[in-house]
Curated annotation (Swiss-Prot):
Top-rank lineage group of the source organism: Bacteria
Posttranslational mods: Is synthesized initially as an inactive proenzyme. Formation of the active enzyme involves a self-maturation process in which the active site pyruvoyl group is generated from an internal serine residue via an autocatalytic post-translational modification. Two non-identical subunits are generated from the proenzyme in this reaction, and the pyruvate is formed at the N-terminus of the alpha chain, which is derived from the carboxyl end of the proenzyme.
GO biological process: phosphatidylethanolamine biosynthetic process
Organism field: Bordetella pertussis (strain Tohama I / ATCC BAA-589 / NCTC 13251)
The gene coding this protein: psd
A Pfam short name: PS_Dcarbxylase
Protein name: Phosphatidylserine decarboxylase proenzyme
EC numbers, comma separated: 4.1.1.65
Protein topology in the membrane: Peripheral membrane protein
Amino acid sequence: MPFKDQLFLASQYLAPHHLVSRLMGRVADCRAPEIKNRMIARFVRRYNVDMSEALVEDPLAYASFNDFFTRALKPDARPLDDEPGAALCPADGAISQIGAIDNGRIFQAKGHSFGLTDLLGGDAERAAPFAGGQFATIYLSPRDYHRVHMPLAGTLREMVHVPGRLFSVNPLTARSVPELFARNERVACLFDTEHGPMALVLVGAMIVASIETVWAGLVTPHKRQVRSVRYDAAARAPIHLDKGAEMGRFKLGSTVIVLFGPKRLRWLDLPSVRGPVRMGETLALPASTAISFPESE
């Protein structure tokens, strides 16, 4: 491994993850024009951000860097595929891994996997509906659209905030940090859908200031304990989201992991798999009509 990679990995273990992220979050929320305009302009140049898709095309018109980063797109920028029964890609990004949940483990990178139960906060009963099911890991790069949408119409059953570290998420850390996605702070949202159980897990990372959902707003840490909120209780009004509807967003984003139960859906075998994807593209079809995807390597 090159020395610079070793140095970067060492810094990941030594850095005060949450302190750095809180400081970056405050800077990203700054509304002083001389600060936020410089940050936004440099970001657009560095990452070649396509503002023609944004509802507000002028990057300097946003009140803060975070407002720019979580910008809305024009209504026709991400048309939804209309294949009956299809599950859509929930976000812009790149599929880093996709396949079957094998013996309660999810593939991370060569030589590394992580536990399904650990990912969902350590509750075996919560994880059981996804045993033997399917997963897809979608990485959102800095230039991507950072809102997350529903692959299927669903009724929210539970939201789980799992505290943890905030390692950077990239190919190097995926190859080198054991159980990366089950160690980083994350928010798991569990839904009931026409194809059975579905989970969307929004994984934080270094300098990810916050994760929001459309029903709860900003999801903030609660000490060091897993916090679960049930939405299927009689005391709460049901929350139902349509297919393609926004369900959450990253302020300085990271990764979305999609989980489905067994024998319901199969991933579509397309050139885009393990490569760039866009929100609204078909990601999976009912098991009776799709081609199974080969095992992760």
